[in-house]
Amino acid sequence: LFYMDRANYEKALKNEDDSTIVEQAITKDGEQNFSWHSESAYGGGGETNVDVEKNKNKRKAVYAMWSEDSKHIAITKVDNRKVKELWVINSIADPRPTLETYKYWMPGEKEAPIDHLIIVDMTAYTYKEINVSLFKDQDVAVWNKTNNVNTRDDEHKPSIWLGTNDKLYLSRTSRDLKKIDQCVVDIKTGAVKTLLEESLNTYVEIQKPGILKISEEFIEWSERDGWAHLYLYDK
């Protein structure tokens, strides 16, 4: 994981291979299939094996969510190292068929991707993992703040986490999709608080919760009685 200042970022936008670009490393522990690059646990990135080798030294995208004060980012780092491979052959590629190899978790397989929630301090350039584990082979999703309508035409729209500078909201889902927790995380202490639990004997659908900023009340969309309703929870 690297960072650069705006001047160098603007250089990279013009020419990614500019040798005068200065960037600093925040982490050095990334490895294939467990990197800081935003790798999917459910499909490939569309690159053929030849393209992967050709582009292996290029910068890769990181999907991160910022705190409102821009002092921290949240990253879900996925460990795909034990997940088995899947292949796609493009038989009509010109001049010869191409092969794409990626990690893919099939139903019934034990080797599952593992989600790790990482908080990076963008003032000290340090990071720590938050323990959000509960369900076996769970999926973790940090909720993003909905952009204001008046920003829809802005050239730059940062991804900001739902919450405050010190707290963020996330969901964790069991492998069978029948249990979902809505949680709030205190990024300073690392404390994870379960706000509510959804559990059904069928698939549970979930929507992003609404947070009332002044009262800190919590609005949840749920089908717990067989119909979709909105529920209001106090602090």
State the predicted function of each range.
Residues 1, 23, 73, 117-119, ...:
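Hydrophobic beta-strand positions in blades of beta-propellers and related beta-sheet-rich domains
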Residues 121-122, 128-136, 148-149, 155-170, ...:
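Long hydrophobic segments that form regular secondary structure
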Residues 2-6, 65, 74-79, 107-111, ...:
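Beta-strand C-termini and the immediately following turn/loop, strongest in propeller blades
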Residues 9-65, 75-137:
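Predominantly five- to eight-bladed beta-propeller fold
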Residues 122-130, 184-194, 230-235:
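Surface-exposed loop/turn elements that mediate protein-protein interactions on large endomembrane-trafficking
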